[in-house]
């Protein structure tokens, strides 16, 4: 048994003893995805965290994801293996700035992407993910003004899909916003038989070049069900691990080399083991914030 096998065995034993569930986002390292009980997108992970009977949730993702699990499951122990695993886009929306913008607009409906902090969710009316953003926007009365926080690209996509005019917060995902049309066009020249599949956090001019726009779970389902054998994947590179496992024989190409989320890659097997041992770093949310943030999440999950 080599060191990695010993580490996995130790994680499995600690998971059993702690009555824990390990949740992983698609953008995690391959070896972390492989030891998880569930791998999914933000919406799937939120639903799993809310429904689990496990006593401990080890969240292999970034801080806002673990925070969301703590909001939905306040009596569970939620641990994030590395506290440095933050989300730059979530940090682009600060609660005081949001309050000021709400006052400026005069009672807008605030739709916050789950890629936000708990206090921003608490100031919001409803949350959304990339998988359900269109459904969320369509659920809002057409006579209400909508402020979309924080991803300008996802908001622009939702506006185009629904025909609604949204006030967009000027945030973005560094990985997706760095994908440019020339990257897609170059990849198409190199792989002319490949379909282009991109995430709605990409720029509008990149989305215009895509054959399919979908959330991470939607991307996985699309490539699995497609009769095509080659795909250019416009999202963080970690997703290609699950695609490769589910679709042996199909080929996946990244349009540029910079499609890596450094925060997601901070989580390692050693840190997962240590988190299970110590039940730290634990993620908690003050009750007065948790209660209000929960309302926004529950409105989303009810759709």
UniProtKB/Swiss-Prot annotation:
Keywords: 4Fe-4S, Cytoplasm, Iron, Iron-sulfur, Metal-binding, Pyridine nucleotide biosynthesis, Transferase. SUPFAM superfamilies: NadA-like (SSF142754). InterPro entries: NadA (IPR003473), NadA_sf (IPR036094), Quinolinate_synth_type2 (IPR023066). [4Fe-4S] cluster binds at residues 87, 173, 261. Pathway: Cofactor biosynthesis; NAD(+) biosynthesis; quinolinate from iminoaspartate: step 1/1. One of its GO terms (cellular component) is cytoplasm. GO terms for molecular function: 4 iron, 4 sulfur cluster binding; metal ion binding; quinolinate synthetase A activity. Gene3D superfamilies: NadA-like. Binds 1 [4Fe-4S] cluster per subunit. The keyword Protease does not apply. NCBIfam families: nadA (TIGR00550), PRK09375.1-2 (NF006878). Catalyzes the condensation of iminoaspartate with dihydroxyacetone phosphate to form quinolinate. This is Quinolinate synthase.
